[in-house]
């Protein structure tokens, strides 16, 4: 049922019927804030050239770095500022503090390219009354890992559209999100000084802003029909490190949102979060049980056995309490159970099992129909993406096991990857 709901959300994109804003109708200013640290200079220059063509003002903030980014930014009409090394959060907060009279501001990663249509469509949606939005992310790269990441983004799009259907956003992604400037100023204050267990939080800046945006009651949108293009991981090791960091920050903010009673995140966020916690545990438990006790494992898979057992026990308990009608309630309960309850519960269990199988088949068919066109374009990437999903499940278990070391989650703990085209 959950999968059917997710798939039916494919038509909930608020930007589907919105035409890109005409440049002649733009009577306001826009800005882009770009934090940079260790990015490949060719990739960085390509991004800046594109942004300066679209935005009225591009603010580049070097996180403890200057050249060659300063020269590249100034050469293409962007502004450059260098701040002491403090992480992406500090660079973002400083860049936003430099805003003047801009109406909308985009937070853009230094390796993310923004197509013209995405820019103008984003402005059109914001002008319709939204306070912030994020778009679909496409991963660029010829290696199998990058192609698999792009396929994972295709899976994530299904989940993001479901959140948008409920007026929520799963995450205002850090690659490219656009905000109403006055609202961003309010929610970004103190971002770089956020602490947990006495340590500064460095990871999950996008998740932090998303939580704050929901808490502040901002109207958020996800645009499936618009995309930004970023570079995929250059190797499997880099991809695994990214997945581990994202998994940990996801759990971190799930627990923090629960602790702060941030009900505005919506029930789907917490359901998805709890499932993400329980699913790898249950999956590992059932697998271990199947290897140890094959018969019990089969019972868990087959809905008839546990369901019948529960219904029979409940029915026997219920009938045993009916002691006012017959003189011998125990014999009456046994008679009803043997001649009516057994056959009825068997029929009911069979009907529920059939209904579950049909719903599963329909949901699976719908999922395959959505994914198949993408899989035909890149069958190898599709296969490797399944492997990454399996790895992510293992990383989820590892993250939960190392929950007692949560303070070590608060830092990226790695040198930025140097990428080239």
Predicted region positions:
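Short beta-strand-to-loop acidic/aromatic patch adjacent to the donor-nucleotide binding site
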Residues: 102-113
């Amino acid at each position: 049922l959950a999968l059917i709901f997710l798939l039916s959300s494919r038509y909930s994109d608020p930007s589907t019927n919105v035409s890109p804003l005409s440049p002649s109708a733009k009577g306001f200013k826009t800005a882009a804030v770009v934090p940079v640290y260790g990015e490949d200079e060719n990739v960085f220059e390509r991004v800046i050239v594109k942004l300066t063509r679209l935005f009225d003002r591009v603010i580049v903030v070097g996180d403890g770095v200057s050249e060659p980014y300063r020269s590249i930014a100034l050469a293409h009409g962007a502004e450059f500022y260098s701040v002491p090394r403090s992480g992406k959060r500090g660079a973002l907060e400083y860049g936003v503090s430099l805003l003047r009279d801009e109406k909308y501001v985009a937070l853009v990663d230094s390796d993310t390219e923004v197509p013209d249509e995405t820019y103008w469509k984003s402005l059109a949606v914001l002008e319709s009354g939204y306070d912030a939005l994020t778009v679909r992310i496409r991963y660029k790269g010829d290696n199998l890992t990058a192609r698999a990441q792009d396929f994972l983004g295709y899976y994530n799009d299904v989940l993001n559209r479901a959140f948008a259907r409920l007026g929520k956003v799963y995450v205002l992604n850090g690659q490219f999100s656009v905000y109403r400037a006055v609202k961003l100023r309010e929610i970004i204050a103190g971002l770089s000084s956020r602490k947990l267990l006495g340590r500064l939080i460095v990871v999950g800046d996008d998740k932090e802003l998303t939580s704050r945006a929901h808490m502040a009651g901002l109207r958020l949108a996800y645009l499936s029909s618009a995309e930004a293009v970023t570079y995929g991981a250059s190797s499997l090791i880099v991809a695994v490190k990214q997945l581990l960091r994202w998994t940990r920050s996801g759990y971190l903010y799930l627990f923090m949102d629960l602790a702060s009673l941030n009900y505005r995140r919506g029930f789907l966020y917490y359901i998805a979060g709890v499932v993400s916690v329980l699913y790898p545990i249950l999956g590992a438990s059932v697998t271990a049980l199947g290897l140890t006790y094959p018969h019990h494992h089969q019972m868990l898979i087959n809905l008839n056995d546990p369901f019948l057992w529960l219904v029979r026990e409940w029915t026997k308990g219920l009938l045993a309490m009916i002691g006012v009608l017959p003189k011998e309630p125990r014999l009456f309960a046994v008679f009803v159970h043997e001649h009516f309850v057994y056959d009825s519960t068997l029929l009911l269990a069979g009907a529920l099992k059939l209904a579950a199988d049909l719903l599963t088949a329909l949901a699976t068919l719908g999922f395959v129909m959505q994914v198949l066109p993408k899989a035909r374009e890149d069958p190898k990437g599709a296969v490797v993406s399944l492997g990454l999903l399996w790895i992510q499940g293992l990383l989820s278990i590892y993250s939960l096991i190392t929950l007692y070391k949560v303070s070590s989650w608060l830092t990226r703990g790695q040198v930025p990857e140097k990428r080239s085209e």
